[in-house]
Amino acid sequence: GERYFTLQFSCPQQPKAHIVFVPPFGEEMNRCRALVSEQARRFARSGYACTIIDFYGTGDSQGELRDASLQIWQRNIHLTLETLQREMSVPLILWGLRLGAFIALDFAAKSALAIDSLLLWQPIIAGERYVTQILRQRVASLASKEGAPETTTEIRKRLAQGESVEVSGYTIGGALMADIESLSLAHLTALC
């Protein structure tokens, strides 16, 4: 399977629960990494063990982002939660930020694993709109360079044809962008 990295923050005593952090996408994670680590330390000091996931193809995990998919990332969450359930019998909480919050919500709606709570920070609410925002970053960065301007529609076509594109220093593939685009709150009414 895909190898991925986790960082764990343990409690000095038996934890009240174990919180698993589901990260945001791309530069959003890099910009908030210190904040997330500090919050995880605070959770641990308050009696809540915490694990931060670097999804396959991101951070310190193996693989390339262009080869990632939502299915792979959900397997990363599943394996992490399954391992924690085997190791300790405490409630499990998914904590997600931005895209990670939406992925956590989607995972909780579809998973057979017992997830006791969700902690969602600034969740995106529409995958298609979020992908458009990501692709606009590419359009904006290319606008200052010579050559014909590229539109989000053209980028979507390239991704759909299996090409990878670079956005803000990250090479992304069509499968992941299609997966993110398909996320919709309308499909998650089972949690309401």
Model-found features: residue ranges?
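Active-site signature of alpha/beta-hydrolase-fold catalytic machinery across serine-
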Residues: 106-110
